[in-house]
């Protein structure tokens, strides 16, 4: 479970990134997090991964309390959270298999575990036939799938996807979201940070809207008053995405 209660985060310059943010995400939920640039979304992600602590308020992530967490416990917290970065952060000199295996070696997994787990995860994301390829030989959609595999390989209880469809065409975007839905169906909590209004509407999940460091809306749909401010221009054609959904 992820729980923020009256969370304030003040940076050294005196700017507040969060101003009393309160939200709770239960185990196994699929949630969209939306908001304009500078609203506090990145700060929330950094707190969930243990990179930042709150100035005041409480943050609980998968059994860990950020106010009381010890430095040596942070790596264990991070093992419960897999992050799919917007820029992928893949290692071009490594193969697909090696990119995913590297994420397991970093946390001390045994080679036997790696040989069993990596092929399973690559099959889950549809890259089992591309194990020997390098990231720079792959399409954007395939690179995104590889980034998801790497985030998933250590079996985290939570996946955070930061703008996972930002550089993809409508068809590839829908495929990536369908993959995240499949991962969620296996019991993993999924938090998707996005500006894509059409994806949010089509997948019809819980939406948490943040603005100026506070949660201003938390529901199964985006209130009309918020839509214009919190989304980019209509990047996807509604007809294209509807066809893909069918």
Roles of regions detected by a PLM:
Residues 49:
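Helix-to-loop junction immediately C-terminal to a conserved catalytic motif
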Residues 57-65:
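Conserved ABC transporter NBD signature motif
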Residues 94-102:
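Short coil-to-helix segment of the ABC ATPase nucleotide-binding domain corresponding to the Q-loop/switch region
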Residues 134-138, 142-144:
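Conserved ABC ATPase signature
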Residues 153-157:
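A short, proline-enriched helix->beta-strand linker immediately N-terminal to the Walker B motif
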Residues 159-162:
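Catalytic Walker B motif of ABC-type/P-loop ATPase nucleotide-binding domains
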Residues 170-172:
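Helix N-cap at the start of a conserved alpha-helix in ABC-type nucleotide-binding domains
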